[in-house]
Amino acid sequence: MNLTPREKDKLLVAMAAEVARKRLARGVKLNHPEAIALITDAVVEGARDGRSVAEMMQAGAEVITRDQCMSGVAEMIHEVQVEATFPDGTKLVTVHNPIR
């Protein structure tokens, strides 16, 4: 299987998000990379499902809460920017204050 660097990045994010989901299911609080991966994956998958940029900006901020993260993680993440593929092309989605 020959993957482009971008495809490899997307696969890595998807795998990291899956690890984060399993940890949340076990009651483990997420660290910084896990939180970013979970938010990023939600935005990418929502875009593939045909949702709008505005919808994904809002939905990205509803993926995880402060209580699901280790202490200080929410304060470290002011915004998450994701290049996502929408039905009409690739667009940059910025999620401001994604952990509330």
Curated annotation (Swiss-Prot):
List the GO biological process terms: urea catabolic process
Class of enzymatic activity (EC top level):
hydrolase
Disulfide topology: none
Which EC numbers characterise this protein's activity in its record? 3.5.1.5
Q: What SUPFAM superfamilies does UniProt report for this protein, alphabetically?
A: Urease, gamma-subunit
Q: Which UniProt keywords apply?
A: Cytoplasm, Hydrolase
- What catalytic reaction does the record list? urea + 2 H2O + H(+) = hydrogencarbonate + 2 NH4(+)
Q: What is one cellular component GO term in this UniProt entry?
A: cytoplasm
Cell compartment(s), UniProt: Cytoplasm
Task: Indicate the family of this protein.
Answer: Belongs to the urease gamma subunit family.
Recorded protein name is Urease subunit gamma
Species this protein is from: Ruegeria sp. (strain TM1040)
Q: Which gene encodes it?
A: ureA
